Curated annotation (Swiss-Prot):
The keyword Lipid biosynthesis applies. It is found in: Mitochondrion. One of its GO terms (cellular component) is mitochondrion. Its EC number is 2.7.8.7. It comes from Eremothecium gossypii (strain ATCC 10895 / CBS 109.51 / FGSC 9923 / NRRL Y-1056) (Yeast). Keywords: Fatty acid biosynthesis, Fatty acid metabolism, Lipid biosynthesis, Lipid metabolism, Mitochondrion, Transferase. This is Mitochondrial holo-[acyl-carrier-protein] synthase. Belongs to the P-Pant transferase superfamily. AcpS family. It catalyses: apo-[ACP] + CoA = holo-[ACP] + adenosine 3',5'-bisphosphate + H(+). One of its GO terms (biological process) is fatty acid biosynthetic process. The lineage of its organism: Eukaryota, Fungi, Dikarya, Ascomycota, Saccharomycotina. One of its GO terms (molecular function) is holo-[acyl-carrier-protein] synthase activity. Transfers the 4'-phosphopantetheine moiety from coenzyme A to a Ser of mitochondrial acyl-carrier-protein. The gene is PPT2.
Length: 174
């Protein structure tokens, strides 16, 4: 599916984006609040818990977050949604992918998801990076109220990206 990309750069249209996958996750905030009550920030239990699904950048950011529960829930939901957007037989285990990506804010405060290729390489999943993630990006939306936080991820590629099966078809037809 090709989606027109209406953002303009100067007077040039940036082209189209192709949706490769979508994912969403919903977190019940009282559950996260209770979890963090039992594992307060700075404790060994919290460090072990965060190390299971947070990138080093997120672990550092968690210590300074004004609202720990919202921060942790936002990171968790974003990664669950990302995993659903890239799900497939060749995907690495969820925990590996969770530790290899990180949620951060862009220059104007919008949430973004980045993938650390070095983390995937150290975990032995460079092929997944090369075939499924390189040349793509993740669009992230996070919303919350008192009791719930939801994250939506759209995995997109520009018109130059070729998935492995497309590269094989092009090679066979050449």
């Amino acid at each position: 599916m090709l989606v027109p990309h209406d953002r303009m750069v100067g007077n040039k249209r940036r082209g189209t984006m192709r949706v490769l996958g979508i994912g969403t996750d919903l977190v019940y905030m009282p559950r996260v609040v209770e979890l963090l009550r039992r594992m307060p920030a700075g404790s060994g239990a919290h460090a072990r818990f965060a190390g299971k699904f947070m990138h080093a950048r997120e672990r550092a950011g968690a210590l300074g977050a004004k609202d720990q529960a919202r921060y942790v829930a936002g990171v968790w939901a974003a990664k669950e949604a990302l995993y659903k957007a890239v799900a497939g037989a060749d995907a690495p285990p969820a925990a590996t992918l969770y530790r290899a990506c990180y949620k951060e804010a862009d220059a104007v405060g919008r949430p973004t998801l980045q993938v650390d290729a070095g983390e995937l390489q150290r975990a032995g999943h460079m092929r997944f990076w090369e075939e499924r993630l390189a040349g793509t990006r993740f669009l992230l939306s996070v919303s919350h109220d008192e009791d719930y936080l939801v994250a939506f991820v759209c995995h997109v590629a520009d018109e130059t990206f070729r998935a492995p099966d497309e590269r094989q078809r092009i090679t066979k037809n050449s």
